């Protein structure tokens, strides 16, 4: 978080209305889930993202948010593996993430899904880490590569010592386990400095980069080593 290097991007889904304005994911994801077509949107988004990676020879990581519905879709991994092979993408540079609140519904299904994900060479991240009651159980049970720390902890770090303590302890534990940490909602230089001071590996937020249709050249991230 202290080097200023770009090493990753996260995909964001948007739909352009007829008047040219953009509709955010929060406006259509739930509708797509109810209609049973969210997996089709996920597939379309991934195909566009992988094509862009191939066109630009992008070398960084790409984080992709998953709907919990994919956990029960057997064709998801087959289709995703087919896409990365078609576009010549190293699956180790693709990180699929689920929010912590989405992981609590069926541990066995999630465990099977993550293990299959890892067998195909992809990476796995837990988003909003620390927002639920089972955070540490996840990183004990699942082969997690990244944890994205709940943004509320990050935005309050400068004025709340308890939040700083939470972030520091998550960072220390993750380092011991060989898991990389990402601070979300980093929106000022002061917060970035505070995050770097706790040993967090990567930072994400408006201060480090805003949504864009282009891929900023990125460097490869070396693997984390257990402490």
Residue ranges: model-predicted function:
Residues 1-7, 14-19, 67-74, 93-108, ...:
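EAL-family c-di-GMP phosphodiesterase catalytic domain
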Residues 2-10, 35-109, 185:
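Catalytic core of bacterial c-di-GMP phosphodiesterases, primarily the EAL and HD-GYP domains
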Residues 25, 110-113, 135:
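Short beta-alpha junctions and helix-cap segments that line functional grooves
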Residues 28:
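Conserved, function-defining core regions and hallmark residues within catalytic/recognition domains
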Residues 80-86, 112-120, 169:
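Catalytic-core regions built around general acid/base machinery
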């Amino acid at each position: 978080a202290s080097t200023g290097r770009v090493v990753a991007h996260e995909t964001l889904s948007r739909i352009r209305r007829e008047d040219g304005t953009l509709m955010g994911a929060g406006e259509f994801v739930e509708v797509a889930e109810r209609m049973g077509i969210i997996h089709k949107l996920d597939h379309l988004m991934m195909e566009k993202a992988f094509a862009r990676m191939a066109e630009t020879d992008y070398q960084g990581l790409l984080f992709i948010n998953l709907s919990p519905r994919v956990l029960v879709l057997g064709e998801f991994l087959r289709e995703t593996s087919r896409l990365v092979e078609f576009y010549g993408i190293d699956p180790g540079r693709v990180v699929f993430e689920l929010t912590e609140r989405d992981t609590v519904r069926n541990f066995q299904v999630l465990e099977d899904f993550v293990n299959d994900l890892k067998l195909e060479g992809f990476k796995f991240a837990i988003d909003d880490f620390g927002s639920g009651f089972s955070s540490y159980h996840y990183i004990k049970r699942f082969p997690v590569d990244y944890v994205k720390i709940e943004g509320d902890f990050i935005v309050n770090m400068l004025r709340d010592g308890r939040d700083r303590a939470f972030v520091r302890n998550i960072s220390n534990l993750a380092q011991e386990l060989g898991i990389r940490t990402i601070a979300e909602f980093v929106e000022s230089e002061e917060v970035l400095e505070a995050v770097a001071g706790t040993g967090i590996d990567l930072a994400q937020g408006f201060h480090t980069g805003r949504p864009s249709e282009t891929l900023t050249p990125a460097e490869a991230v070396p693997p984390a080593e257990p402490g």
